């Protein structure tokens, strides 16, 4: 979609792009094997690149990085155990959407939604990776 709409945004001298990424790249999560985390990392870096490359043309691009968000996704994907995570870990989808819109309108490149998710992302940077991976493995075993 960016490829399709970016040229007209450049011609108009104005545009806003939101890419829905995830908290996953910021925290260790061995249960997200495969391509999920790498794709989300790409979305974040892609958003940063578009934002910086086209900022002088009036275009802002934001990567919105929510944690667990209440939608039908987890149940439809057969991730029933994730859907049973404690309520305090979840965000409302309307809140995530509103925060994402506010972020792009204010020129913020990366948004980690919610205080708890920001705390998790910061904590993952501070704790040695060997410890955070061990914690993630333990939590994953409990959930499945």
Task: Give a label for each model feature.
Residues 63, 83-121:
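C-terminal helical subdomain
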Residues 27-34:
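Active-site loop immediately N-terminal to the catalytic Tyr-X3-Lys motif
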Residues 39-47, 61:
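Conserved catalytic Lys-bearing alpha helix of Rossmann-like short-chain dehydrogenase/reductases
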Residues 22:
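Residue(s) in the substrate-gating loop at a strand-loop-helix junction
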Residues 2-3, 48:
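A short, exposed helix-loop element centered on a Lys and neighboring polar residues
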Residues 66-76, 80-81:
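Short, flexible catalytic-loop segment of classical short-chain dehydrogenase/reductase
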Residues 8-9, 27, 49-59:
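Active-site-adjacent segment of SDR/Rossmann-fold oxidoreductases
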Residues 2, 38-39:
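Active-site helix of classical SDR
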């Amino acid at each position: 979609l960016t490829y399709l709409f970016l040229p007209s945004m450049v011609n108009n001298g104005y545009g806003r792009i939101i890419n829905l990424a995830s908290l996953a790249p910021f925290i260790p999560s061995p249960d997200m094997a495969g391509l999920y985390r790498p794709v989300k990392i790409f979305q974040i870096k892609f958003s940063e690149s578009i934002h910086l490359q086209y900022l002088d043309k009036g275009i802002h691009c934001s990567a919105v990085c929510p944690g667990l968000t209440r939608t039908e996704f987890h149940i439809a994907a057969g991730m029933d155990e994730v859907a049973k995570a404690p309520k305090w870990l979840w965000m409302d989808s309307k809140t995530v959407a509103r925060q994402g819109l506010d972020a792009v309108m204010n020129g913020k490149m990366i948004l980690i939604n919610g205080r708890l998710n920001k705390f998790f992302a910061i904590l993952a940077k501070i704790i040695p990776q060997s410890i955070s991976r061990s914690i993630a493995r333990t939590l994953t075993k409990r959930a499945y």
